[in-house]
Regions:
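Catalytic-core regions of core metabolic enzymes
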Residues: 1-213
Length: 213
């Protein structure tokens, strides 16, 4: 619904166990039935146990980016940690850029795309948002709607298993449609390395960093 409501003009497809028409979109029962070369990215909302095979099916159809919203990974104990490592290894093997898992989605106003499972579509602007907390992204997008202060991109990094907040901020630093980066971080594994990377980012664009508990 959010993708359609934002006015995204690219090809949109979906899977559904019954193969029904959903919101006017024809669906297929399996990713293996997706027409080859039709899509660039898959938004994964299926159980963690099915996602390895799903990535393989998508890769076979030419999809090279995946945003995994599914929970049940590194935040879910030892078994989840193992599942997350397998997910990352599979994505790398297949040449798929992996965002998430356990994130809420991604927004790009220049592309009129709101692939976000919770938040509203914000007005266009020049702020790039990257957050470890999906709720922070949702709150900021609601604030953006309320104030009219627009954004360029927003991404909920989730567990950041393969791509983290610093990676998104480095992209914002080179993005001609973003003037300032806003980041929210909770857990930091290697603080010195993170600060070194953010220091380089701040040489190109202003950066606001919020550290949560």
């Amino acid at each position: 619904h959010n993708i359609l409501a934002s006015g995204y003009a690219g090809a949109i497809g979906g899977t559904n166990l019954q193969g029904e028409t959903v919101l006017g979109i024809e669906t297929v029962t399996s990713a293996s039935d997706i027409p080859e070369g039709s899509y660039d990215m898959v938004l994964v909302c299926t159980p963690a146990s099915s996602n390895i095979e799903l990535l393989r099916q998508c890769a076979a159809k030419g999809i090279r980016a995946a945003f995994v919203t599914s929970a049940g990974y590194g935040e879910a104990g030892d078994a989840g940690v193992i599942a997350e490592r397998e997910l990352v290894a599979t994505a790398r093997e297949l040449g798929i850029l992996l965002a998430g898992p356990n994130g809420q989605g991604v927004v790009s106003t220049p592309s009129q795309m709101c692939a976000q499972i919770v938040a509203p579509y914000p007005p266009a602007g020049r702020i790039g948002v990257a957050s470890q907390s999906g709720n922070f992204v949702s709150s900021f997008l609601n604030w953006s709607r309320a104030t009219g202060i627009g954004i360029s991109r927003a991404v909920s990094a989730g567990n950041a298993a393969a791509v983290g907040v610093a990676d998104y901020l480095e992209f914002f630093a080179t993005d001609p449609l973003t003037d300032v980066g806003l980041a929210y971080v909770e857990g930091i594994v290697d603080g010195r390395r993170l600060m070194n990377r953010l220091s380089k980012v701040s040489q190109d664009k202003p950066l606001v960093l919020v550290k949560g508990g």
